[in-house]
Amino acid sequence: MIKVLFICHGNICRSPMAEYIMKDLVSKAGLSDQFEIASAATSTEEIGNPVYPPAQRKLAEHGISCEGKTARQMTRRDYETYDYLIAMDHNNLRNMARFVGGDPEHKVSLLMDHTRRPGDVADPWYTGDFEATWQDVLEGCTALLEELR
């Protein structure tokens, strides 16, 4: 079982989009029984809140439901539980360090570093551009799945 945790600031936009896009890609590839995929926040601001409505709508446009998902904060145990901890931006990486300390097992990376366009996934909470975030996350998850197959 390959265990992947996607992480962003609040766990209401980018990381749940990544979680559900990856679940969709894995399902379409017939690999659902080989993956455990989840998402979490580095902050406490949105704990218990559902996925932000514009992010829900963007997923729904592509036939993907995130119904029932609520934000949770990552924990130190997540480093032990998951094989891959995938951050959306450099700020997430810095904030993750308070939970995981170092990364001796080399489990932590940026999503876009798995593509030909390394860097950050812009936060649509601030940009308002959920389409650009969709495109980046889809590209990142597609590349990550290819690596993990």
For each feature predicted by the language model, list its residue ranges.
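Helix N-cap/beta->alpha junction signal
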Residues: 15, 89-90
